[in-house]
């Protein structure tokens, strides 16, 4: 599978998930790790049993969109497997994805079946797809552009999906290619990471509303006021995780407001 490059972005990955990198040993592997000084590079190269691995890093958390775009620009093969550390996939599944996308000139990306429900159709063209594991036709994706870097962690896939649906290209689910996604297990669990995820989900939602012209000022005001009071209520009732979530929503709104002012 030399004509496939696998790209994975990492942020505080759990040690027990790193063995999953060997699922891609027959492909070229590109890793981008965030918020690190690159000290883990040797560990990844020791774990990975394949021949071709390249490692990139940033000292700051620059977000999924930006780090993924950096990796896609470095891909030299015709096809690219965009995936995550908490995905379980085998070689047969990757080959099934490859066999379909090679034959269909209008397919920009294909996804395995996450539900494991057998269907008569070999593949289904769809307008909605799970972006956690997709095989991409690199040339086609470069024509329309990958992730919008105004998004940090969430909603970039939905925005890209809309862009693909407006293009001449199609997306498809390959029904006999199965994959397991142990969602939200690609990073260690901590209050800080929970806060970052929650903040950027709200931030991404507001960015999406802005770009699709669905944004309403009244929505932002209501969301801010509601979660401002709920934050203190959760603190007083000792519901720490819920209070972190409310604080993250407030943080996401403030991050969006800063984004708007910096864009002017």
Identify what each model region corresponds to:
Residues 134-136, 140, 144-145, 150-178:
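A short, conserved alpha-helix in the catalytic core of glycosyltransferases
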Residues 196-204, 213-264:
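Non-catalytic, C-terminal membrane-associated alpha-helical segments of glycosyltransferases
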Residues 27-38, 56-58:
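Short beta-strand/loop segment that forms part of the nucleotide-sugar
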Residues 88-122:
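Conserved donor NDP-sugar-binding/catalytic core segment of glycosyltransferases
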Residues 58-75:
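Glycine-rich, basic loop-to-helix element that forms the pyrophosphate-binding segment
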């Amino acid at each position: 599978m030399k004509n496939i490059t696998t790209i994975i972005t990492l942020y505080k990955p759990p040690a027990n998930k790193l063995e999953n990198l060997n699922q891609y040993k027959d492909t070229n592997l590109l890793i981008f790790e965030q918020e690190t000084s690159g000290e883990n590079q040797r560990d990844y190269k020791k774990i990975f049993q394949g021949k071709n691995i390249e490692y990139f890093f940033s000292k700051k958390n620059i977000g999924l969109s930006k780090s993924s775009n950096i990796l896609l620009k470095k891909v030299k093969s015709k096809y690219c497997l965009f995936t995550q550390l908490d995905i379980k996939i085998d070689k047969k599944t990757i080959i099934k994805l490859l066999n379909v996308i090679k034959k269909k000139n209008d397919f920009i990306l294909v996804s395995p079946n996450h539900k494991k429900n057998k269907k008569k159709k070999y593949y289904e063209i769809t307008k909605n797809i799970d972006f956690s594991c997709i095989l991409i036709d690199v040339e086609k994706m470069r024509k329309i552009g990958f992730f919008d870097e105004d998004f940090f962690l969430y909603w970039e896939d939905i925005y890209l999906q809309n862009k693909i649906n407006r293009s001449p290209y199609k997306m498809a689910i390959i029904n006999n290619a199965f994959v397991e996604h142990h969602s939200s297990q690609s990073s260690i669990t901590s209050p800080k990471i929970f806060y970052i995820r929650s903040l950027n989900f709200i931030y991404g939602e507001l960015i999406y509303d802005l770009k699709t012209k669905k944004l309403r000022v009244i929505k932002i005001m209501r969301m801010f006021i509601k979660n401002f009071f709920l934050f203190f209520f959760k603190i007083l009732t000792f519901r720490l995780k819920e209070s972190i979530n409310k604080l993250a929503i407030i943080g996401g709104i403030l991050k969006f407001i800063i984004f708007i002012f910096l864009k002017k």
